[in-house]
Each structure stands twice: as C-alpha cells, then as structure tokens.
Swiss-Prot record:
Pathway: Cofactor biosynthesis; (R)-pantothenate biosynthesis; (R)-pantothenate from (R)-pantoate and beta-alanine: step 1/1. GO terms for cellular component: cytosol. It holds the Pfam family Pantoate_ligase. The active site is at H8 (proton donor). One of its GO terms (biological process) is nucleobase-containing small molecule interconversion. ATP binds at residues 1-8, 125-128, 154, 162-165. Its EC number is 6.3.2.1, 2.7.4.25. Residues 1-251 are annotated as: Pantoate--beta-alanine ligase. Disulfide bonds: none annotated. It comes from Prochlorococcus marinus (strain MIT 9303). This is Bifunctional pantoate ligase/cytidylate kinase. The gene is panC/cmk. Catalyzes the condensation of pantoate with beta-alanine in an ATP-dependent reaction via a pantoyl-adenylate intermediate. Catalyzes the transfer of a phosphate group from ATP to either CMP or dCMP to form CDP or dCDP and ADP, respectively.
Length: 488
C-alpha cells in the first residue's frame, strides 16, 4: 500500500531466486486501498511517499511501479463495485475478527489487480499471514492462473517486524513495542521444550508493559481455526496497539522439522525430481526405493529365493544399510559395507524388487529404519508407501505419476545412460504395467495414493517444471519462516 521499506525491497529481490522460471519483468503495485480501512482507521493519514517508493523499487530491481488512483482501479468509485466475500471461517479469528470487512476489501482489490495485470507470479509477505492464506484460497478456488510466492517476515535490527506504520512510533514507544516479538519468540522456544503456550500470560505481560492487546491466539496455520501447539503447524499471532499505532506479529510452533512424502509408481521420475527438490530446499533426501533395491541385491548375492519370506528374513539379521548424501549424482547406498549405488539399478534387481518388497518382514524392518531417520524431520522421502505407512503425518504428500507409455520412454533412456541393454518400448511398458499391478495388489503396504496427497501427473512436464510445482506445493504447507530456502 505504499510507504515502501526494506521488507518490500526484499519481496522484489526474491524474484531473482526463481531460476529459469524468473518472470521477464517485475511490476510493483502501490495502491492505498480504501476498502481495507474501517470508518475509524487511518486511511487519510496512512503514509504516502511516491517518490521514495519509486526510488526503493528501482533500487531493488523492479521493472516498473504502478500507482493508480482509486478511480482507475474502481471506475465510478469503490462503493459502486462488486465485492468478493471471504468465507467466514477464514476471517473468524485474528485480524478478521477485529477488522470486519477488511479481508473482503483485500481480496476484492487483489482480484481486480490480477485481472488488470495478469501476472505469472504474485509475491506476498508472510508477515500478513492471514492475508496470505486467504489470497492463496482465492487463487486456488477461482482457478486463477498465477503462482503465489511468500517471502519470510523481514525484521529491523532490533527485532521489530518491518511495517509502514512503524514510522508512527516515537523512540520510547518503539522500545515498548519490542516486547511484541520478544515475548512471541520466547513462547516459541518454550513450546519447543514441551511447555504449553500461556495466552493469558502473554496478554498480561504485554498489558503490564503498556501495550493494548487486541488479540493473542493460536490457530491452525492453514485453516486459521483454533489449535493448540502439537504435531500440526500452529500459528501464534498477536495484534497490539502501542499508543495509536497498531502492530501485528506472529511465530510458528512445531514439534519437529517438516517432512515431505513423495509416492508413486515405478518410472515416474521420483528419484530424479526428489533429489533435486531436496537439494533446492536443503532437505535430507531419503531414497527408500534404493533401500528395497539394496535388500533385493543382497538376496541375489546370497542366492536366496526372493519369493520365500522365511529365507529373506534370515538376511535381514544384523543388516547394515547406509544412505550417504552425495554432492553430485545419486545418493550413495551401502549394504553390509558394499557400495551398491549402481548395482541396485540393474534390470536383474528391478525385476525382483517388487517381490522382495512385498514381504512383511522386509517392510517392517525398513519402515522402522526410515522412521528413525525421520524422527527429527527436515527430510523428503520417496517410495511407494511413504505417505500412507512411513510418514502418515508428513506436512506435504504428493503422488507423482505418469502414463505407462511415458514411464517406459524414461526407463529406456535411463537404461541406455547406464549402459544396460534397452528392450523394446512395448516390452518395457508391459513390464511397468505388471510392476504397477504387483505393487498395488500386494497385501502389505500396497501402492496407493494417500487421501490427503496431491496427485501430480508429469506427462509433458520438464524436470524443472515438476520441481517448481513441488516447491510451490511445499510452500503452501511450509512457510519460509519455518524452513528457509538456502541462500534466500
């Protein structure tokens, strides 16, 4: 809304990290929206400095700045326009409860902006978290052709979240206001240690320091309904007044780092994109398929009948299986001291892995090991039953798939690149369909899409497009403030 500061500059600069999907131009829109202000709020006195805004936008890398008048955005006046109404459950708490009609005004003007500009990407700050959640719902439910990109809250050196309204604060008031982020941060640390958030205690502490508390609440970070801290990502948010200045801030509460589960059939490209996705976001990559392949390789080395669960179980005793991150190429896989990184990709292993993986003793042993690896989170795992059996509480679940014909084509390329003989495409497609049948009909942990997973069909998509889609899905569930993108 203008009065740009360095947090707005960070929004503009963030576009430079979009890689090959970076938009050709970056437009900054400056518009003090009358629909967002209540009758007694500061619309008339809201800070405006267009010359300074233009300078900051240019310095930060903007291609242009658009500062329309009210008549340009709302021909005939704001009161004569249709308005979009935000679903009541999304604004029943936090700022929505305190400022009735505010978010209706936000979505109405943003929808108007998107219709006029038709951007590829909409960049928003995570500081106004409720606004970001509501606008993501708007884009998703209306099917608008735009990606929503969130940027972590930017803070001044003293810890106060950047805001255009901070300039209202006198020196002494700013010192008072610092209690807002400081006590939120302390509550987050205590929550990590297993202590419950004391909302009444926070309110009392702020009031004793001279701040007027409008609200302090814990809500689900995505449906914005009341929630106590636990496994799910929880938002602890507050709004206070310091003198005449209204300030909002928040922190996220979570018992562990995020987990991503990517399931799908053989040949869907899971390993390739998951490895790149993990590297892009700084997550540990857990290739569970490689673990099953390694056990299959071991059965072949010991001449064990892969169909005999009793015989297979004997080689699981004292099993030493290691996955070692690699700076380049596939993840290193070692079993009982043997480096089997390449060997487990052979056609011989591929033809038997479904049989071995179907045994309950194998899945029990490897699932337990995978869950131990993921106890602290901070990882992405790919396989067949990650979202349904291994990490059913993962923050993001994706079912990555492609048509059998497309998967056969990819398998042929992979075999050729590895120096293995390449069967006819029709034969490969038949093998893949049979593998799908075996994986989806086995009694133990069959291949199936988790109820809360997002299906991603990758036919016709480049590897980079699949990775960017996964990142977008991740950021809907995991804010930058919870898991920052490396180098951001």
């Amino acid at each position: 809304m203008g009065a740009l500061h360095r947090a707005h500059g960070q929004l503009i600069k963030s576009v430079q990290g979009f890689g090959s999907l970076q938009p050709a131009a970056v437009l900054v829109s400056v518009f003090v929206n009358p629909l967002q202000f209540g009758p007694a709020e500061d619309f008339d006195s809201y800070p405006r400095d267009l010359e300074a805004d233009c300078e900051l936008a240019s310095r930060s890398g903007a291609s242009a700045l658009w500062a329309p008048s009210v008549d340009q955005v709302f021909p005939g006046g704001a009161s004569s326009q249709f308005r979009i109404q935000v679903p009541s459950h999304l604004q029943a708490h936090l700022c929505g409860a305190i400022r009735p009609g505010h978010f209706d005004g936000v979505v109405t003007v943003v929808a108007r902006l998107l219709a006029l500009v038709r951007p590829e990407v909409l960049v928003l700050g995570e500081k106004d978290w409720q606004q970001l959640v509501i606008l993501r719902h708007l884009v998703a439910q209306l099917g608008l052709p735009v990606r929503v990109h969130g940027v972590a809250t930017v803070r001044d050196d003293d810890g106060l979240a950047c805001s255009s309204r901070n300039r209202y604060l006198m020196t002494q008031q700013r010192q008072q206001a610092l209690a807002l982020p400081q006590l939120l941060a302390r509550a987050a640390r205590e929550s990590q240690d297993g202590r419950a958030v004391d909302l009444a205690g926070l309110r009392c502490a702020w009031e004793q320091l001279g701040l007027e508390v409008e609200y302090v609440e814990t809500v689900d970070a995505f449906n914005l309904q009341p929630l106590h801290a636990g496994r799910k990502l929880c938002l602890l948010a507050a709004a206070v007044r310091c003198g005449e200045t209204r300030l909002i801030d928040h922190t996220f509460l979570m018992s562990r780092q995020p987990i991503v589960a990517i399931d799908g059939p053989a040949g869907a490209g899971k390993s390739t994109v998951t490895r790149a996705f993990a590297e892009r976001l700084g997550l540990l990559y857990l290739d569970t398929g490689a673990m099953y392949r390694a056990v299959t390789w071991l059965t072949q080395q010991h001449d064990v009948d892969p169909h005999d669960p009793v015989a297979v179980k004997t080689i699981l005793e004292n099993l030493e299986l290691e996955l070692e991150p690699s700076q380049s190429g596939p993840q290193k896989v070692r079993i009982n001291g043997h480096d089997v990184t390449e060997a487990i990709r052979s056609p011989e292993v591929t033809s038997s892995v479904s049989v071995v993986a179907a045994h309950g003793c194998v899945r029990k042993a490897l699932t337990a090991q995978q869950q131990r690896m993921g106890v602290r989170g901070g990882l992405v795992a790919e396989g067949r039953d990650i979202g349904t059996a291994v990490f059913p509480d993962a923050e993001l679940k994706v079912f990555l798939t492609a048509s059998p014909a497309e998967r056969a084509r990819r398998r042929a390329l992979d075999l050729d690149n590895r120096g293995f003989p390449v069967p006819d495409l029709a034969e490969l497609e038949t093998q893949i369909e049979e593998r799908d049948r075996m994986d989806s009909t086995r009694e133990v942990a069959p291949l199936r899409q988790a109820e809360d997973a997002t299906e991603l069909i990758s036919d016709g998509m480049s590897i980079e497009e699949v990775i960017e889609t996964l990142i977008d899905l991740f950021r809907v569930q995991v804010p930058e403030e919870v898991w920052p993108t490396p180098g951001s």
